[in-house]
Structure formats: C-alpha cells, structure tokens
C-alpha cells in the first residue's frame, strides 16, 4: 500500500454525490490532493474550477484538478460515486445490473494505473457493488470499504436525538445490515449517554416503543421520501463519505458502521454488509461483533441472505 507524505483522494463520478463529497473534503481540509475523474469531462473540469475558486476560504488549501485514471496510481483512496442513479419507486437493488457493468470497467481502469490504496464505494446498491469491487480489484478485503449503513446510523441518531431532545453526538445507536429495505435497528445496544434506550422507555411513560418503531421506519424509508421531494440524496451521504475518508487518512481507529466483508462474524460469510468496524489507515482494522438479540440476529441473517441471493447469479463461480 502506498505511503506518501501527501494524501491524495481520487474521486470517480462528479454527479450530485461526488461533487458534494468533494465540497465536504475541501471545507474540512481532509486531504491535500483531490483529483476528479468523470466521463463528462466538462462537468469534472467545472467542479475543479469552482472548488479551486473557493479554496482560499477553506481551512487549508487542497490541490484540486480534473484528471484521469493514471492519477489513481498515487492515490491513497479511490472513492467511487459513479453509476446509474436511483429513480423514484426504484429500490437500490434494482440498480444491480446497470451498475455492475459500469463498475467492471471503472475498477479495471483504476487497477491498471497501479493503484494500491483503499477503495471507498458509495454507489448503490452499495453492499453489492463493494463486493463486486473487491472481486474485480483483487485487493485484500480490508482495503475495500462501502459506505454501508453509516448514513442510516446517522439518520437514526438524529431522529432519536430529536425524540429524546438530546444532541445526536450523545446518542449511540447502530443501523446494521443491507443499506436498504432489510436493514435493522440494534435496539439492544442503543443508548443515550450510557442509559439504554429500552430502559428510558420503561422509566418514562412519555416515551413509547411504538413511537420508536415508527422512528425506525422513517430512517429506513428516508431516501424514498427525499428522492420523491428533490430527486436524489447527496448531502448526507457525502458527509458520511468524508467522515470515513478522515478516519482512514488520519489513522483514527474510529468505529463506523460501514459495509465490510464478513468471514464468520455474526454467523455470516462471503458477503459485504453494514456493521460497526474499526477504520484506520489500513482500511478495516477489525469488525466489532455485537451480541444481538434473537430477533435482531434473525433480521440480520435475513438481510444477509437477501444480499447473497442478489450476488449469486453474478458471482456464482467465485462463490
């Protein structure tokens, strides 16, 4: 893996998510170099120009330019945001066929550059495409990471914070599983400032589990509501991607709910799925295996099964 004094992120895909991610990187000065790659050269060039014009207002200047796949050779992270977008009424899994073809071409071109860093995948269905990137690239599983349920967990913490009138930073809760319709809340490990959420419910009649069940539905279906209102989701996921990038480049050893490869954890194998993991400069340092309730384990197994059923027709020989 490349170790340089200057951090470089290569962004592939300058659509709504990609450009929002680039904006977040510059505003937080997360990387020293950012190269933008897109099939639409004018869009990528325009983004690079626009971002450079605002660079003096950022905490630190980030060298930003429009480039090509050769620039991936010295990248520490290649973040892929390219692909077909989710349309109203379309699930993330409906996008599989279209995006697998796109990803094969993208990953092949990145690897041909001599890239030896970490892949960060955002394109949906993210768990499927992260697995595909791992297979296409031949990189160690620890160095291929998907955004997974980082945004779902962020939505979860935000809405729980609203419900209990507590800052989201003091809400500790995870959404795990597929980034999609079969994801699940881990109520057994959700707490507010160290006090279990389930205990808060029993202590105070003002709080009801029925409310929290609906709260989770709002988390799960958030993307559909946002897509219906504005056509796409991009700010939240871009900020989540920036958070993962920061954890990698700063060697933070931070616990984030990302899509990572399971090899026996949670009773599952050969699948990329959203779980809490320790993220640092090497990628995934380790997976944190939560002790799930019986119901949660069944739901997680179902989520994993759904993903495997989608993967099987495309990677049957490899599996």
Swiss-Prot record:
The modification Phosphotyrosine is found at residue 224. The active site is at residue 179. Its EC number is 1.1.1.27. One of its GO terms (biological process) is lactate metabolic process. Allosterically activated by fructose 1,6-bisphosphate (FBP). Keywords: Allosteric enzyme, Cytoplasm, NAD, Oxidoreductase, Phosphoprotein. It comes from Peribacillus psychrosaccharolyticus (Bacillus psychrosaccharolyticus). Beta-D-fructose 1,6-bisphosphate binds at residues 157, 172. It comes from the Bacteria. Homotetramer. This is L-lactate dehydrogenase 2. It catalyses: (S)-lactate + NAD(+) = pyruvate + NADH + H(+).
């Amino acid at each position: 893996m490349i170790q340089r004094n200057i951090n470089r992120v290569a962004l592939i895909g300058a659509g709504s998510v990609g450009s929002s991610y680039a904006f977040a990187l510059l505003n937080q000065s997360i990387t020293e170099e950012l190269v933008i790659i897109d099939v639409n050269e004018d869009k990528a060039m325009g983004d690079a120009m626009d971002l450079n014009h605002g660079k003096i207002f950022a905490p630190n200047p980030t060298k930003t330019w429009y480039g090509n796949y050769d620039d991936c050779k010295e990248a520490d992270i290649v973040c892929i945001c390219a692909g077909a977008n989710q349309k109203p009424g379309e699930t993330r899994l409906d996008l599989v066929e279209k995006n697998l073809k796109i990803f094969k071409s993208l990953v092949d071109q990145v690897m041909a550059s001599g890239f030896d860093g970490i892949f960060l995948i955002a394109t949906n269905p993210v768990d499927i495409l992260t697995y595909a990137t791992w297979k296409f690239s031949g990189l160690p599983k620890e160095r291929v990471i998907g955004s997974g349920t980082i945004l779902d967990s962020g939505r979860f913490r935000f809405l729980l914070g609203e419900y209990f009138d507590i800052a989201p930073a003091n809400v500790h809760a995870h959404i795990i599983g597929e980034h999609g319709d079969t994801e699940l809340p881990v109520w057994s490990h959700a707490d507010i400032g160290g006090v279990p959420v389930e205990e808060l419910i029993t202590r105070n009649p003002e709080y009801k589990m029925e409310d929290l069940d609906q709260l989770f539905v709002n988390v799960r279906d958030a993307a559909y509501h946002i897509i219906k209102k504005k056509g796409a989701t991009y700010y939240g996921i871009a900020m989540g991607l920036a958070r993962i990038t920061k954890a990698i480049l700063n060697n933070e050893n931070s616990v984030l709910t990302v899509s990572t490869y399971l090899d026996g954890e949670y009773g599952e194998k050969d699948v990329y799925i959203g779980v809490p993991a320790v993220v640092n400069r090497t990628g995934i340092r380790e997976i944190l295996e939560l002790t799930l309730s019986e119901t949660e384990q069944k739901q997680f197994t179902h989520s994993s099964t759904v993903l495997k059923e989608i993967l099987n027709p495309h990677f049957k020989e490899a599996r």
